[in-house]
Amino acid sequence: MAFAGLSCMALLGLPQSAVAQDMTVYPYAEDYQVITRDGAWCWFSDPRAIYVDDKMFGGFVDKEGSIWAFCYDPSTCQSKQYKLFNKLDYDDHANPSIMALSDQRLVLFFSAHGGTKNSPIYYAVSKYPSDISSWEEVQEINPEMEGSLGVCYTNPVMLSDENNRVYLFFRGRDFKPTCIYTDDLKTWSQPINLVRNDPGYGQGGRPYTKITTNHKDKIFFAFTDAHPRDRATNSIYFMMYKNGKICKADGTVVSETLGSIIPSQVDKVYDATRTFDKAWIWDIAFDESEKPILVYARFSDRDNKHSYWYARWNGIKWENHKITDAGQWFQRTEYVKEKPEYECNYSGGVYLDHENPNILYTSRP
């Protein structure tokens, strides 16, 4: 767990519990180690930090828009930083994602905010295993896609059962979830549209996606219809990739290939058309039986309040449980009675412990 700016630059820290899994005594929220006092994350690029060779590695974007890698050693409480790219984009959407290759070399992926700038996807590979002190030259990927706007939100996945093929998921043109893949980190596939709108909604939606993997043969996806400010009935969906196919949580195959899924084909985990409380996905994990678990925020327009919810696939159906009320949106702009808050769907946040998803972390403003 880490503290990160969502629409502003913030101190980035890691709780001591993130590196010590003994939960006999639950930590205070203030019990964290500082990684940087000038760094931000956005919650739709993952992984933002990984644990390799008893150290934590990750990245962040600073207040000048520069991209950094970091290493944190919990045995000494010392951290190191390395600037990978200078002044890319002053925007939390530019924060990098990170993965480790089979030889423990590190790869960082990043891009500018696709809604404001049209930049490539950048990536860099460390020269040595578990080491941020030296990197190969930064590479560019320029996927050929139809539509407008740029790319952002990188999510790399490597599957050992597919000879360590690397899949890179990201927001592509027209805000649509997209995928490319590589077997050598040099040559990339043509882009694959992952999710598209149900026909009745046209092409204007922007599904927000969270991704996790067992690193072997499965990739788990949770996604929305759109941004919650754009859809009064913004619901939450689930699907899973396995053996080249897209499945529901019960294993039912809905597509023989990766891509071009519409929401009505897969599991609707939370149905906002029944409550008219729109939702936004926050995290996805799975239990020891690889049954998926999601956490998300719901927004009530009746009283302008947020709430956090936990959804678990029990092997037969999805169970949704309320965690807690979550206050209102976290930013505090100048209040004008005649002018409603435009960005009222940004919550403090809710995250799962991926080692034990019975544990979760919340923040309430």
For the regions a protein language model found, what residue spans apply to each?
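Extracellular, repeat-based ectodomains that mediate carbohydrate processing or recognition
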Residues: 22-365
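Boundary at the C-terminal end of the N-terminal hydrophobic targeting segment
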Residues: 13-22
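Bacterial N-terminal signal peptides
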Residues: 2-13
